[in-house]
From Swiss-Prot:
The keyword Transmembrane does not apply. GO terms for biological process: translation. This is Large ribosomal subunit protein uL5c. SUPFAM superfamilies: RL5-like. The gene is rpl5. It comes from the Eukaryota. PANTHER family: 60S RIBOSOMAL PROTEIN L11-RELATED (PTHR11994). The keyword Plastid applies. Keywords: Chloroplast, Plastid, Ribonucleoprotein, Ribosomal protein, RNA-binding, rRNA-binding. InterPro entries: Ribosomal_uL5, Ribosomal_uL5_bac-type, Ribosomal_uL5_C, Ribosomal_uL5_CS, Ribosomal_uL5_dom_sf, Ribosomal_uL5_N. One of its GO terms (cellular component) is ribosome. NCBIfam families: PRK00010.1.
Length: 180
């Protein structure tokens, strides 16, 4: 099944961007490469239950199995040993990426209380965008009764654009609600 946002990209966004930036080749048009969802869990080293519930929640939200990230070296001030679980990461590409982006834009972000839009200043110098969400309850897959602990996540949308302006316009065309 072709995702709605992928179809929107091919039929309307690509021609708009080609006209606006005067691209000669369709392959010059920026696109979304991947979406990385990350959740750091500082308390995971003490409790396996928090790690397991976080892993299951992220898998449910993303629709794909994630990877448990582990510490690379020991840091005494954080009471952290080497190779201890410190978070969960899911990388989405292709159809699942477009499906997640669609759910995030149309279902999750509007459910945030007092939502004014997302900050347009969170782009890196290559046109990729990162945002942090404070809780997982905004996603329709989450049920309040089944959540052990409310914790946020970081979402990075990696694009092929080379400039911030290109990335911003690309994500605006997809429907990401940026603040004015």
């Amino acid at each position: 099944m072709k995702q709605r946002l992928k179809q929107l990209y091919m039929e309307t966004i690509v021609p708009k961007l080609m006209e606006k930036f005067k691209y000669k080749n369709i392959h010059q048009v920026p696109r979304i490469k991947k979406i990385v969802i990350n959740r750091g869990i500082g308390e995971a080293s003490q409790s396996n239950k928090i790690l397991e519930s976080s892993f299951k929640e992220l898998n449910l939200i993303a629709g794909q199995k994630g990877v448990i990230t582990r510490s690379k070296k020991a840091i005494a001030t954080f009471k952290l040993r080497k190779n201890v679980p410190v978070g969960v990461t899911v990388t989405l590409r292709g159809e699942r990426m477009y499906g997640f982006l669609d759910r995030m834009i149309n279902l999750a972000l509007p459910r945030i209380r007092d939502f004014q839009g997302i900050n347009p200043k969170s782009f890196d110098k290559f046109g990729s965008y990162s945002l942090g969400l404070e809780e997982q309850l905004m996603f329709p897959e989450m049920e309040y009764d089944k959540i052990d602990q409310i914790c946020g996540m970081d979402i990075s949308i990696v694009t092929t654009s080379t400039k911030i302006e290109e990335g911003l316009i690309l994500l605006k065309e997809f429907g990401l609600p940026f603040k004015n």
